[in-house]
Amino acid sequence: MGLTIQVGAADQVLEEDFAKVLVAVLAASFPGAGAEPREEDTWYSPELGWSGWGALQERVERVLGAGAAPHFLSMEAWFGAYLPVATEPGVLQVGDDETPFSIAALSALTEELERFGRAANLPTDREGLTRLADKYEDDDLCDDDMDLQTYAQVLLGALVARERRQPLWIIK
């Protein structure tokens, strides 16, 4: 199973019962988090190789230095969201779920990835990111540069999430 980055309401991305509880927790702790139901379609990336997230985190840390991207580096590619509100990286306990739900700020993620992109001489605009992502749709290249594929899709998703004021979901 790979990783798909998503932007949308909680009820479009998560199981219904969990989504209801999470929306209530987010509304109480982070007004304006954008997880409530909406009519907009969910934006989602193509399925990415699971190894790309960790490879990108390693590359970001190598290029920017230790501690330079705390929001991006705080999130495992498992169970969390970048929220369109000011917050520090952390975890929430949601209902009776044993797995803590990771959160970080969408604006900080976007800034960190754009700074990384500039430092690594990669595109940071939607058009350039789309071209970079499209390059890897070729069957001969689909297993190459998992970190770059992940970078393009995460930053594209972050730009969409910022525009919509919705969370960027990192959910297995």
Language-model segments: residues:
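Acidic (Asp/Glu-rich) sequence patches and key acidic residues
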Residues: M1-R164, I171-K172
